[in-house]
Amino acid sequence: MSNLLKSALEKERRHYSEKLYQIGVYNKEVMNKMTISELRKEYAYFFRSITNHKNYPYTR
Protein backbone atom coordinates (compact mmCIF):
# COMPACT_ATOMS: atom_id res chain seq x y z
CA MET A 1 0.00 0.00 0.00
CA SER A 2 2.77 2.45 0.80
CA ASN A 3 4.36 1.88 -2.62
CA LEU A 4 1.04 2.62 -4.27
CA LEU A 5 0.63 5.83 -2.29
CA LYS A 6 4.20 6.87 -2.98
CA SER A 7 3.85 6.32 -6.72
CA ALA A 8 0.55 8.22 -6.77
CA LEU A 9 2.12 11.20 -5.00
CA GLU A 10 5.08 11.17 -7.38
CA LYS A 11 2.72 11.06 -10.36
CA GLU A 12 0.68 13.96 -8.95
CA ARG A 13 3.81 16.02 -8.29
CA ARG A 14 5.06 15.34 -11.83
CA HIS A 15 1.71 16.37 -13.34
CA TYR A 16 1.51 19.69 -11.49
CA SER A 17 5.18 20.45 -12.09
CA GLU A 18 4.93 19.78 -15.82
CA LYS A 19 1.86 21.97 -16.24
CA LEU A 20 3.32 24.88 -14.27
CA TYR A 21 6.61 24.58 -16.15
CA GLN A 22 4.82 24.57 -19.52
CA ILE A 23 3.17 27.92 -18.89
CA GLY A 24 6.45 29.34 -17.60
CA VAL A 25 5.40 30.13 -14.06
CA TYR A 26 8.28 28.50 -12.20
CA ASN A 27 11.56 26.88 -13.05
CA LYS A 28 12.29 23.29 -12.05
CA GLU A 29 14.58 24.21 -9.15
CA VAL A 30 11.83 26.17 -7.42
CA MET A 31 9.22 23.48 -8.01
CA ASN A 32 11.47 20.77 -6.56
CA LYS A 33 11.50 22.71 -3.28
CA MET A 34 7.72 23.12 -3.19
CA THR A 35 5.41 20.71 -1.40
CA ILE A 36 2.61 18.94 -3.23
CA SER A 37 0.10 21.16 -1.43
CA GLU A 38 1.86 24.27 -2.71
CA LEU A 39 1.95 22.85 -6.24
CA ARG A 40 -1.79 22.10 -6.05
CA LYS A 41 -2.58 25.64 -4.91
CA GLU A 42 -0.46 27.21 -7.63
CA TYR A 43 -1.95 24.94 -10.27
CA ALA A 44 -5.47 25.80 -9.15
CA TYR A 45 -4.68 29.52 -9.12
CA PHE A 46 -3.27 29.64 -12.64
CA PHE A 47 -5.44 27.08 -14.40
CA ARG A 48 -8.78 28.04 -12.85
CA SER A 49 -8.22 31.66 -13.82
CA ILE A 50 -7.48 30.55 -17.40
CA THR A 51 -10.68 28.50 -17.66
CA ASN A 52 -12.69 31.34 -16.11
CA HIS A 53 -11.32 33.73 -18.67
CA LYS A 54 -12.22 31.33 -21.50
CA ASN A 55 -15.78 30.98 -20.22
CA TYR A 56 -16.31 34.70 -19.62
CA PRO A 57 -13.83 36.58 -21.81
CA TYR A 58 -15.63 39.93 -21.75
CA THR A 59 -16.35 40.26 -18.04
CA ARG A 60 -12.81 41.07 -16.97
From Swiss-Prot:
Induction: By phosphate starvation, via the PhoP/PhoR two-component regulatory system. Keywords: Stress response. This is Stress response protein YkoL. It comes from Bacillus subtilis (strain 168). The gene is ykoL.
